Amino acid sequence: TLYNKLIELLKKGKQMDKSKEKCAPENMVLSDTERWKNIDRHKAEDYVRKLQARIVKAQREGRHGKVKSLQWLLTHSFYGRYLAVVRVTTNKGKNTAGVDHVRWSSDAAKVKAIDTLKRRGYQPMPLRRVEIPKKNGKKRPLGIPTMKDRAMQALYLMALDPIAETTGDQHSYGFRKYRSCQDAITQCHDVLSRDVAPKWILEGDIKGCFDHISHEWLLNNIPMDKEVLRKWLKSGYVFNGSLFPTEEGTPQGGIISPTLANMTLDGLQSLVQNAVKPYWKPADTEYGRIRIKPKINLVRYADDFIVTAKDKETIENVILPLIRQFMAERGLVLSEEKTKITHISEGFDFLGFNIR
């Protein structure tokens, strides 16, 4: 049964974990600080990396039961929990506390934190909401989880990220390893600098993407522990001393939120490209009769995206209706004010660059 397989995998994981701390002299009792320093980080990273590779392999083979088993093994492993604590105590937000005002600043606190990262009985605390000023004078809400909740998100992200990278859109560049804003701009130039390049651009703008993603869609479609995900989504937030519920969206500030947003928008590229296949036009060439593609390309960086097309009518009559439907299924809408159709001769702004 699946339960027996999980137990067998856990036993194997414990066998691999048994040498997680460097050997100390017999009968010697280590302090918490010494225990933290004695953990072999390279061995931990190697253990997690191998599990992630197995998750990728199982995902590609369509073995979803195996994927779940491996995810469970990773999120319950000592090494996975250790690396989650390492991440939240070494990143930029390590000195920023949540609503409980707790920081894991000492090695002793870190090693004790490892044992607290358990699914059983886990209940996340509300986010501490702050507002960050934007260049346009408006404010962007930022939800700050507690250290423990950040570490739990980091832990489960290790098990989710291999799937996100395996199934992600080819030309999605935001919040992904080894990809950058510059890669997205390079792809735009590659598409638009060809001799027969498309001339029309749809500049897509999603209204409050992170704040409005449907919880129901996330729970039905994100391949991770549903109970843990539900608790994060429904944890609420504290602002000006008052507690507010969260009925939609994934908070900006959570470690796992960018990946959840990316996975929500994955599939958009294939949707628009496949939608125009019926509109491919036959043409006679010196090589024989071929079908001319309508030059549809999508480039996305997080929730910012552009779509290219040969003519304006294709965007208006085919692409835009499909994108609106895609967004509506996920609880999202395009901003009518900021979503524009532009001819390449006019140029367009994307990720801080003007392309023409």
Describe the predicted segments one by one.
Residues T1-V111:
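Non-catalytic, polymerase-adjacent accessory regions of viral genome-replication enzymes
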Residues T75-Y82, G93, L160, A164, ...:
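Short alpha-helix boundary/capping elements
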Residues S105-P124:
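Amphipathic alpha-helical blocks
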Residues T116, R120, K135, T167-H171, ...:
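Conserved polymerase palm-domain catalytic core
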Residues P141-G143:
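Conserved phosphate-binding loops in nucleotide/dinucleotide-binding enzymes
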Residues Y156:
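Nucleotide/phosphate-binding loop and acidic/charged catalytic motifs
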